[in-house]
Amino acid sequence: MTSKKLVFISHINEERELAKILSEEIKSSFLGLLDTFVSSDGESLPAGGRWLDSIDAALTNSAIQISLCSPQSINRPWINFEAGASWIRRIPVVPLCHSGLSKSGLPIPLAMLQGADLDNADDLKFVFAELAKILGAAKTPTIDYCGLIDKCKIFIETYTYFNKVREAIYAACNAEQQLEKLFFSGTIQSIPVSIQDYRFVHLAPALDVLKDLGLVIYTFHGTRIGSDGLFRNGNITLTDKYLNVILPRIKQA
């Protein structure tokens, strides 16, 4: 383990690129005097290393933890587990909020910590001032906070877009299970649908989101009465944008 002061950056896998941006900024701003642990960067966790042991060692040896908190990550157990592990060790933990979550929206127990918003320059000044304290420095390095925010914004805009798409897809599939093959197989571009009216109420909003984003085209053109009630008949077609841009990204997740 490095002899430098260590900053543990806690994040979920989908936010690894944001963790790397923050890691690089910390290292360059403090001229390499601070090291970072980012579990997805291929450097903090050597190939073949025991993952949990490496995490535990990094938590034990870290001087501060920055937890990347988004609407997605705060619902994952590891973010809370790692924050709790550092808190028990009396290691400072700073929740850094992004992608639609603000520090005022943090849930308990993360709300009990002093959080910061990634898109707020004053909050970033606080975070980097905390890092400077670790080194015993009286002043924080000169940092282009607006430039850092802009770097992060590129990731966040893409990330929130794909989360919106993913949520709409899963909502559609929950409303009508037969759509799973359409959205995930990559072998079907269009499918006829006959869906019970009460299910359509849940399906339509999800399809509208995807339609507005140019990812699906759908029409419902008639109804029929079956033994199970009223059904709506229609057709759902995936656009080339969905098949070429969205589907590969979903399969990587």
Residue ranges of predicted features:
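C-terminal interaction surface of TIR/SEFIR-family domains
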Residues: M1-F8, E15-K27, D35, G100-I217, ...
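Residue-level signal for short, function-critical loop segments
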Residues: H11-N13, S70-P71
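Conserved BB-loop
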Residues: E24-D56, Q72-W78, F128
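Arginine/glycine-rich "motif VI" loop of SF2 helicases in the C-terminal RecA-like domain
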Residues: S28-L31, G84-V93, S99, G105
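An anion/phosphate-binding loop that grips the pyrophosphate of nucleotide cofactors and donors
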Residues: S62
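Generic beta-sheet signal
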Residues: L68, L96-H98, L118
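Conserved TIR/SEFIR loop-to-helix hotspot centered on a Trp-containing motif
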Residues: P71-R89
